[in-house]
Swiss-Prot record:
Entry similarity comment: Belongs to the ThiI family.
GO MF term (any one): tRNA-uracil-4 sulfurtransferase activity
Cited PANTHER family: TRNA SULFURTRANSFERASE
Organism from which the protein derives: Bacillus licheniformis (strain ATCC 14580 / DSM 13 / JCM 2505 / CCUG 7422 / NBRC 12200 / NCIMB 9375 / NCTC 10341 / NRRL NRS-1264 / Gibson 46)
HAMAP family: ThiI
Residues annotated as domain THUMP: 60-165
Record's keyword annotation contains Cytoplasm: yes
Protein name: Probable tRNA sulfurtransferase
Length: 401
């Protein structure tokens, strides 16, 4: 039988009440973006389900991409037939005959979305199961652990038959919860933070601080590749590359070495906040995990956060490094993150950074230098690259938007 349909089931979207249509529309838009290479696919959506009509496109390739789209609870490759008993029986038998081998077991499960259908769920299971048994050899029923599990979904307009459910990414559709900026360094942690931000329905724009000649073009490319990898979960992402060399050089000259890391983080946050405001985002995400390094103690976070009233969200705050690495491997960012190209924070790491910096002290040290012109210059000269799951990218400058 020609399995030319994919049934998509929603997760948390189903709890959204009156706003459900907005979430479904966003999910449909995201799926279309991720599947833009598959030009023959057609989309049908209702309040409770979405159906993709493949029109001959590669089903396995389409499903491989759907696994990463947030907002999908599960999905199934399906055969479609008319909603009448004889048509369902014929389609079910033909589908099972294509799949089974002698000695296999099977089970039939029916869901009646169309309650006016002539048989109820139990009657349908018995009718279809009996029809299959009478017309196959060496195939038996096992309702607990079958080799073949035939699921039948009866709707008024059509009936769909499936044999396997694929787990989706869960969460909420990217973009349904607003926009946030992700501070991305090129390390292991920040892409994972971006993943979790997107899972909760946020559209992200990434911000990376680039300090040539201290950091190389290969380090920049690593961040581009990481951001591109995240596009698999929700479509295009803007990456803002901030020129940070002058600012870091001034920090090295004017701020005591043990407080230079704190000053660097504070200035990065101020620049990210200005970009957030310019691009109409509402929060900033970081990959910080409490106590992991000197700049991620509670005292450091307090001193750094003091430069902004914008929410700074840290989804990895309670995770240890092993957990973060496992998630990075799962989402395929780990191998990119461990490429041996250092970012600007690594290059300028002091030998003995202050692990419990005082907010009053860093404010005192910074008061002798006017960093504002360099902050504004960095924002104005920020380069923006629009990354997508397709091969090409677009270079733009931040002031274009």
């Amino acid at each position: 039988m020609n399995e030319d349909y994919i049934l998509i089931r929603f997760g948390e979207i189903s709890t959204k009440g009156k706003n459900r249509k907005l979430f479904v529309d966003r999910l449909k838009r995201n799926i279309k973006m991720v599947l833009r290479d598959f030009r023959n696919v057609r989309y049908e959506s209702t309040r409770d389900r979405m159906t993709l009509v493949l029109n001959g496109e590669d089903a396995e390739a389409v499903m491989a991409r759907l696994k990463h789209v947030f907002g999908i609870q599960s999905f199934s490759l399906a055969v479609k037939c008319r909603t009448d008993l004889e048509s369902i029986k014929e389609t079910a038998l033909a589908s099972v005959q294509e799949q089974y081998k002698p000695g296999d077991t099977f089970k039939v499960s029916t869901k009646r979305a169309y309650k006016q259908f002539e048989l109820n769920t139990n009657e349908m299971n018995a009718e279809i199961g009996g029809h299959i048994l009478r017309n196959t050899d060496d195939l038996t029923v096992d309702v607990h652990s079958p080799d073949i599990h035939l699921r039948i979904e009866i709707r008024e307009d059509a009936t769909y038959l499936t044999f396997r459910d694929e787990k989706g990414a869960g969460g909420l559709p990217v973009g349904s919860g607003g926009k946030a900026m992700l501070m991305i360094s090129g390390g292991i942690d920040s892409p994972v933070a971006g993943f979790y931000a997107m899972k909760r329905g946020l559209e992200i724009e990434a911000v990376h601080f680039f300090s040539p000649p201290y950091t190389s073009e290969r380090a920049k490319q690593k961040v581009i590749d990481l951001t591109k990898r995240l596009t698999a979960f929700g479509g295009d992402i803007k990456l803002h590359i901030v020129p940070f060399t002058k600012t870091q050089e001034l920090i090295q000259k004017q701020i005591p070495e043990n407080y230079s890391m704190t000053a660097t983080r504070r200035l990065m946050l101020q620049i990210a906040d200005k970009l957030r405001e310019r691009h109409n985002a509402l929060a900033i995400f970081t990959g910080e995990s409490l106590g992991q390094v000197a700049s991620q103690t509670l005292e450091s976070m307090y001193a750094i956060n003091a430069v902004t009233s914008t929410p700074v969200l840290r989804p990895l705050i309670g995770m240890d490094k092993t957990e973060i690495i496992e998630k990075a491997k799962e989402i395929d960012t780990y191998d990119i993150s461990i490429r041996p190209y250092e970012d600007c924070c690594t290059i300028f790491t002091p030998s003995a950074p202050k692990t419990r910096p005082k907010k009053e002290k860093i404010e005192h040290f910074e008061s002798y230098t006017d960093f504002e012109p360099l902050i504004n210059e960095a924002v104005e000269n920020t380069e923006t690259i629009v990354l997508s799951s397709k091969a090409e990218t677009k270079d733009q400058f931040a002031d274009f938007f």
